[in-house]
């Protein structure tokens, strides 16, 4: 499953949170994420104190466990998402989307 994760960091937690993240090595980041999450892309709006990523994992529980590592520092939203191929498969078989 693919998940879109967004985060926003409150002003009072911004500098400590970004300092902690900025000090992490690639290995630290992988350890923080765990072995069962594949990071497909992550982007940061540093001035806006927010960002997002797309990850792949077997379950929401796996992604939620990673999110708990940062839950005290930022507001996190996790949404299951589909790529174009999967979305088209759902839409093509849905009765509301069938051509008449």
Regions found by a protein language model. Name each.
Residues 1-100:
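Conserved, structured core segments of small domains
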């Amino acid at each position: 499953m693919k998940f879109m994760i967004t985060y926003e960091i409150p002003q009072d937690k911004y500098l400590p949170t970004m300092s902690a993240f900025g000090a992490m090595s690639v290995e630290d980041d992988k350890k923080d994420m765990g072995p069962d999450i594949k990071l497909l892309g992550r982007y940061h709006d540093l001035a806006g104190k927010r960002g997002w990523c797309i990850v792949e994992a077997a379950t929401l529980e796996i992604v939620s466990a990673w999110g708990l590592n940062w839950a005290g520092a930022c507001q996190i939203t996790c949404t299951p998402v589909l790529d174009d191929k999967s979305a088209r498969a759902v839409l093509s078989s849905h009765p509301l989307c069938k051509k008449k």
